[in-house]
């Protein structure tokens, strides 16, 4: 969403949410399938997380409908808070090199499901895959190692995001639907490039990049996004 809004000049509305969610879904499929091939998933925890994530996504769609014209401001404030919190937690992990040993610990399924519900909500409201929520939920409450946390998170998104896309599409007005179809060629190109990029990116990541490097790269990307939202609110 930030790329379309700040670079492409698109307005933050339900049309942009649908496009951003569509690309997030395609990315999750491209990378999620590769993680599944390697066995980096836990289907039991994925099913449990979906009990929270799918209702959360529906609640998020309802929230967007209710807030109406106030949605843009609420979106940016919520983005600053949530993305800022995620950056803070990840930076702490890098600085202190915290080792979260999961062996022998019992999964906290209630907390994992609740956090997954929040992830589904953010998917609909912030137009993101919500991996920033699902991965910690899988790792810290599901007690999965890093690769399985990422793979399970992607497989959750493969199910949740299509629900949010359909729900948002059903409440578009006629003008937004026409505008969306006018961009069909661009969307097709973006879908193909995102799918191939995420697929090959996952394969390369398995063999070439350490978890520490990927975390630092993710922090850098999130920080740029956070600064954009903050400046937009303040100025």
Model regions: which residues?
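Interfacial segments of multi-pass membrane proteins
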Residues: 1-15, 133-148
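Helix-loop-helix "hairpin" substructures at the membrane interface of multi-pass membrane proteins
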Residues: 103-135, 141, 154-161
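Transmembrane helix-bundle signature of multi-pass membrane transporters/permeases
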Residues: 17-25, 50, 54, 153-161, ...
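Hydrophobic alpha-helical transmembrane segments
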Residues: 1, 19-32, 63, 99-104, ...
């Amino acid at each position: 969403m930030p790329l379309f809004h700040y670079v492409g000049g698109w307005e933050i509305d339900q049309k942009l949410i649908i496009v951003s969610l569509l690309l997030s879904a395609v990315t999750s499929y491209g990378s999620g399938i590769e993680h599944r091939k390697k066995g980096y998933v836990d289907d039991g925890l994925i099913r449990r997380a979906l009990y929270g994530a799918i209702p959360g996504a529906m609640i998020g769609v309802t929230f967007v409908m209710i807030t109406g014209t106030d949605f843009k401001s609420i979106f940016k404030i919520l983005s600053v808070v949530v993305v800022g919190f995620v950056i803070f937690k990840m930076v702490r992990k890098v600085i202190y090199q915290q080792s979260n040993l999961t062996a022998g610990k019992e999964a906290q399924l209630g907390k994992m499901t609740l956090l997954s519900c929040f992830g589904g909500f953010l998917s609909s409201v912030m137009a993101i895959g919500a991996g920033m929520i699902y991965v910690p939920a899988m790792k810290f409450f599901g007690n999965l190692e890093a690769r399985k946390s990422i793979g399970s998170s992607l497989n959750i998104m493969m199910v949740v995001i299509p629900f949010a896309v359909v729900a948002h599409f059903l409440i578009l007005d006629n003008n937004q639907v026409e505008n969306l179809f006018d961009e069909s060629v661009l969307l097709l190109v973006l879908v193909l490039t995102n799918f191939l990029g995420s697929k090959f990116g996952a394969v390369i990541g398995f063999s070439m990049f350490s978890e520490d490097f990927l975390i630092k790269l993710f922090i850098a990307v999130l920080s740029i996004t956070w600064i954009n939202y903050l400046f937009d609110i303040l100025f």
